[in-house]
Design a protein with these regions (language model features):
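Domain-edge interaction signal
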Residues: 1-193
Length: 193
């Protein structure tokens, strides 16, 4: 079985430099796809319900303090990372195909509208630290259900209007800079990813 570090390094090899928020979410959704299709996780590490969405503590420890990272950043010692099997790569490749063009904040908002993250954060305020684990059972149960409107789990990976609306709803033009509209994405309180 792959580790989350193996998956993260593969994502970075395929994408180049990405935000750590985006990396966390792509790893989360790759694992969710494996759970839905095989009833097994892609890797043994778990995710916690942090302020800005699901975060693997093991992966966070590797990129802590950095906003953008690239290939070789997660495991500078190549012996730490093992190549993924073709089967394991298929989950990551499909996740990247459907969600790879999204920014980290868009993926964060997507996860906020989904039960695994929001249920795990029950009892926590919007900006409270939360270390509650998002269970694999909750992940598989939600993403395999009809309630899920995540484009990765819809036939053909097509966006529907509810997802499009949710991803763009929080964007607003608040001012102009040098005569051009300045688009502002609301800041999420807290320092967590």
């Amino acid at each position: 079985m792959a580790s989350i570090l193996d998956v993260a390094e593969y994502i970075l090899e395929k994408t180049g430099y990405v935000s750590t928020m985006k990396l966390q979410k792509l790893a989360f959704y790759s694992n969710a796809l494996s759970l839905v299709e095989t009833h097994r996780p892609l890797f043994p590490e778990t995710f916690q319900a942090w302020v800005n969405g699901p975060v693997s503590l093991e992966l966070y420890r590797r990129h802590r303090g950095r906003l953008i990272i690239g290939s070789g950043s997660i495991a500078p010692n190549p012996k730490i990372v093992q190549p993924l099997s073709a089967h394991e790569r298929s989950f990551v490749d499909r996740t990247l195909h459907v969600l790879g063009d999204y920014e980290g904040d868009q993926l964060s908002r997507l996860s906020h509208g989904e039960a695994p993250w929001s249920d795990a954060r029950q009892g926590c305020g919007d900006s409270d630290r939360c270390s509650a684990v998002i269970s694999n059972e909750a992940i598989e149960g939600f993403y395999a259900s009809r309630r899920c409107d995540n484009p990765l789990f819809l036939g053909g990976g097509e966006l529907n209007s509810r997802v499009t609306e949710r991803l763009s709803a929080k964007r607003s033009i608040t001012s102009h800079v040098d005569g051009l509209p300045c688009v502002r994405w609301p800041a999420v309180c807290g320092s967590q990813i």
